[in-house]
Design a protein with these regions (language model features):
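Glycine-rich "HGGG/HGxG" loop immediately N-terminal to the catalytic nucleophile
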Residues: 54, 80-96, 282-283
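Conserved alpha/beta-hydrolase
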Residues: 61-90
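N-terminal cap/lid segment of alpha/beta-hydrolase-fold proteins
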Residues: 2-37
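Active-site glycine-rich loops that stabilize anionic/oxyanionic intermediates
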Residues: 47-60, 122-123, 252-253
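Conserved hydrolase catalytic core segment
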Residues: 115-156
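Catalytic histidine-centered segment of alpha/beta-hydrolase-like enzymes
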Residues: 279-294
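Conserved acidic catalytic loop of the alpha/beta-hydrolase fold
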Residues: 100-117
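Alpha/beta-hydrolase
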Residues: 159-261, 271-275
Length: 310
């Protein structure tokens, strides 16, 4: 961290529980919880598409979320909202907000507070691999929860809505969608139920509360997530991440992240892979931070971090 970064970090350590970071073009709002105990690195919890950092602060049924759980474990916790999400400003061209632009804003946050553990979910996975390669001094470890792989691993899908629609049930491709980039994408409730709130662990009695938390998404981000037209976020060389501790965690009820897909991402990146049923944890879908055993999975991640001395 340079002198300016160190000064900023000292200021943040005395700041109230929220602040703004990111790039000039794409500022991001950040919640800050807890205080670091000796020897424990801060952790940054990054949400996926259609969500905000609120998914880490509390669960849909009102229990404490992963952010307070990590704070109780003795870590300083930072929870950003992507640009244009939650309390982060939305520009008029939000529909074409790219993965790289979001990653650059998150990279700026890590440069201010790092080195840190970076925990990512779903569509923020490709951003984590990119940030770790671009700014390795800021990322001490990565925990990927059902994370998207780098586009290096994804087949190039045609930039054709009709052709992609024929692949929408192909779990090996992540059940892809292709959307027009002339307006933000509003996620319909039936999509949420099919892919995000589908598991037996999801608190279905709180689905309406969850639905109200979902925000419009950049159409370009969605297309990049499925490597439509080969425009997904790539890394230059997985060897650049070979010395980085990486954990990938996946449940058995996530149609967009079957075991084979996330295991392949782990092999490519040299990561440790946890298929939750092998730890006696069954029934989790795409949103384990919201599900009824969220504390159990948070404890698994905390134990991994502590075993690594992070």
């Amino acid at each position: 961290m340079d002198h300016a970064g160190a000064t900023r970090r000292q200021a943040l350590s005395r700041a109230p529980g929220c602040f703004y970071s990111g790039t000039d073009a794409h500022p991001i709002y950040v919640d800050r919880l807890g205080a670091a105990q000796s020897g424990k690195l801060p952790i940054v919890l990054v949400h996926g598409g259609g969500h905000t950092g609120a998914c880490y602060l509390t669960t849909p049924d009102g229990r404490p979320g992963w952010a307070p759980a990590f704070a109780v474990s003795g870590r300083e916790v930072f929870v950003p909202d992507w640009p244009g999400h939650g309390r982060s400003p939305m520009r008029p061209d939000f529909a074409t907000l790219s993965s790289t632009e979001i990653a650059e804003s998150l990279q700026r946050l890590l440069e201010e507070i790092g080195p840190a553990v970076l925990l990512v979910h779903s569509a923020s996975g490709p951003m984590a691999w990119w940030i770790a390669e671009q700014s390795p001094q800021t990322v001490a470890a990565i925990v990927g929860v059902a994370p998207g792989g780098p586009a290096n691993l994804l087949p190039v899908l045609p930039d054709d809505a009709e052709a992609v629609a024929k692949l929408k049930d192909d779990e090996s491709l992540g059940c892809p969608v292709r959307v027009e980039e002339d307006r933000p994408l509003f996620i319909p409730p039936e999509f949420m139920r099919a892919y995000w709130a589908n598991s037996e662990r999801f608190p279905q009695q709180a689905f309406e509360a969850y639905r109200r938390s979902i925000v419009p998404e950049s159409a370009r981000l969605m297309n990049e997530r499925f490597n439509i037209g080969g425009k997904g976020l790539r890394i230059a060389d997985p060897a650049n991440l070979s010395k980085l501790p990486i954990l990938i965690v996946t449940g058995d009820s996530d149609p967009r992240h079957p075991r084979a897909v996330d295991a392949a991402t782990a092999r490519y990146l040299g990561a440790e892979f946890v298929w939750l049923p092998e730890r006696g944890i069954a029934g989790n879908g795409h949103m384990p931070m919201c599900e009824d055993n969220s504390d159990e999975i948070a404890a698994l991640i905390v134990a991994w971090l502590e075993a690594k001395g992070l």
